[in-house]
Amino acid sequence: MINPILYLVFSLLFPSHDFQITHTSLHYNSDLESIEITMKVSIEDLERSLEINNSEKLKIGTIKEKKSAHKVITNYFNNHLRIFTNDKLSQFRWVGKEIDDNLHDIYLYFEIPNCNQNGEIKSLTLENTIFLETGLNQSNIVLVEFKDSNFNLTFTKDQDIQKIQLGK
């Protein structure tokens, strides 16, 4: 039988949930020739991942949130959700964030502006390593909406890069 005090100590020292899932949608806006990115992630998982790379707590979604939070978040996602249009790495810019009504999740909004400079996007390659440094059972689900086509992709530690052919 497990000692209840020992169990409590380990639960407090190593809090986690059994599995982690992020949801990302990429929507191609043909009028603006941009890719709009919406991510839904756990605030707890985001804080944990950011603390690995950043020494200070950002206190995301609280009144004590650090002013640098959006820069740190953008940097993290530019490094852990790498999007290549026609095999060229794209950088995305911060649009905003909002806390979900459940107070557990956060929606993050980014954009890749002017991503169709050569006239046609023929392929998208995604490298998604979001929270893989912290979550043993991490899955990252991505929905890509490109013109009339939809693609559902799942990324894990064993499969973190996928390519979609878009050109006809």
Q: Model-flagged regions — what are they?
A:
Residues 3-13:
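Sec-dependent N-terminal signal peptides
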